[in-house]
């Protein structure tokens, strides 16, 4: 059981890190709705050439405060 518990804690930890980096707290299904809010898909693509999968995009959020990124 110790192996399973460590595995579960690892998976939840990675999930929390990805969610906190996005600062959204919602699942990947709402990524399309964020596009209308102003800093969804447009923000990620305008700041960095990030692919659609968000876990790979983790280094991207620090670019968010830039005005030119926020405008798109």
UniProtKB/Swiss-Prot annotation:
Low complexity bias (residue ranges): 1-38
Ranges for region Disordered: 1-42
Protein name: Putative uncharacterized protein DDB_G0285569
Organism: Dictyostelium discoideum
């Amino acid at each position: 059981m110790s192996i399973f518990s460590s595995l579960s804690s690892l998976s939840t930890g990675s999930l929390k890190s990805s969610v906190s980096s996005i600062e959204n707290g919602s699942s990947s299904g709402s990524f399309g709705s964020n596009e209308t809010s102003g800093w969804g898909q447009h923000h990620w693509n305008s700041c960095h050439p990030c692919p659609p999968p968000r876990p790979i995009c983790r280094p991207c959020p620090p670019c968010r405060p830039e005005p030119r990124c926020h405008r798109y």
